Amino acid sequence: MQVKNRLTPFFENITFDREDNEMILNFGPQHPSAHGQLRLMLHLQQEMIVKAHPDIGYLHRGMEKMAENMIYNEFMPTTDRMDYIASSANNYGFALAVERLIGLEVPRRAKVIRMMLLEINRLMSHLFWLATTALDIGAMTVFLFAFREREYLMDIMEGYCGARLTHAAIRIGGVPLDIQDTFITQLKTFLDKLPQNIKDYEDLLDTNRIWLMRMEEVGVISKEMALSWGCSGPMLRASGVAWDIRKEEPYELYDEVEFRVPYSDKGDNFARYRIYMEEMRESAKILYQTIDMYEKCVKDNQTELMAHAPKYISAPKLDIMTQNYSLMQHFVLVTQGMRPPVGEVYVATESPKGELGFYINSQGGPYPYRLKLRAPSFWHTGILTDILPGHYIPDVVSIIGTTNIVFGEVDR
């Protein structure tokens, strides 16, 4: 008996909508400069781009649907895999949304530690951006220097939480661990060297003719275009809008620290590069202030790291091991999950790449009824449709680099 395979591939002629003398070039999805699984369909007339169509979805994992089938604490490690270059920012955004939903107030010492983790994460993300963008354009020395400094920060994070990339270092209600004395010492050592390191990067890049050729007056985004596409973070600030959620809608203790919001009205690749460099300097200022705030917490004997809310948060480990009620409550929270009240909340935070938002709809059950992620990289990928036309193929790499997109949060 002959067995016929009913799954034989079916082929058809694919026609592209293109003008005469136009060529369609596929950039990616395996291109080393695509910053992940990005495919661009570029319509070319000779080497000039006339149309660009981003094609996404190659890394889709269904995170929003996964959240609907996980208890709230169970979803926390999944957020690490969104923008995996800045995982603590994702952890924090989700934790803050749940805390707002249930009306939880986090202890001050935990807030200070969270701010430290967030700003260290911002520096790690910006250094990674600088390294990879410089490498894409050919400045390998800066790539090596920036990765050297990022490695130092990864060692600090590893000493705190045991992980170097996907940290899961923030909990709903606070933080699981206090920082060690070596953490502060190592961080101060890094921060003392950072201004000179940033100056070294600028000295190497600002005199590099190829870097300037690919940066100045390339990939210009007007203020109106940035706003209409929903840009945020450095992409928006480089186009003339001085909007930073840490300033405009402060969370944690950002209203108690002094820092500047750098911005530019030029809107080109070079302006975005300058914003990233200035933001690293501002993050260092914030970290110095958080170190002082932490030392004041120690002096004032503010020791609590987790909020006290037995209905939603497990008791301290010592209580769980010695008190019957705390043990039972912990068992229920771990096996069945917390049950936030019926309601909905949207919380936006300033991730290294822009506005990271979490929308949660609760129907009073242990699982979110609906969870929606607002990832900045998604919108910064879409704007390539308007930026790329009028540029040449070599400019594509530098423009993609300065958008700083990560496809873990684009596809989700």
UniProtKB/Swiss-Prot annotation:
A GO MF label: NAD binding
Taxonomic superkingdom: Bacteria
Gene3D superfamilies for the chain: Cytochrome-c3 Hydrogenase, chain B
The EC number(s) this enzyme carries: 7.1.1.-
GO cellular-component term (any): plasma membrane
Alphabetical UniProt keywords: Cell inner membrane, Cell membrane, Membrane, NAD, Quinone, Translocase, Transport, Ubiquinone
UniProt subcellular location: Cell inner membrane
Location, primary (coarse class): membrane
EC primary class: translocase
Membrane topology, as annotated: Peripheral membrane protein
Reactions catalysed: a quinone + NADH + 5 H(+)(in) = a quinol + NAD(+) + 4 H(+)(out)
Homology family: Belongs to the complex I 49 kDa subunit family.
Subunit structure: NDH-1 is composed of 14 different subunits. Subunits NuoB, C, D, E, F, and G constitute the peripheral sector of the complex.
Described function: NDH-1 shuttles electrons from NADH, via FMN and iron-sulfur (Fe-S) centers, to quinones in the respiratory chain. The immediate electron acceptor for the enzyme in this species is believed to be ubiquinone. Couples the redox reaction to proton translocation (for every two electrons transferred, four hydrogen ions are translocated across the cytoplasmic membrane), and thus conserves the redox energy in a proton gradient.
Name of the protein in its database record: NADH-quinone oxidoreductase subunit D
Organism: Sulfurimonas denitrificans (strain ATCC 33889 / DSM 1251)
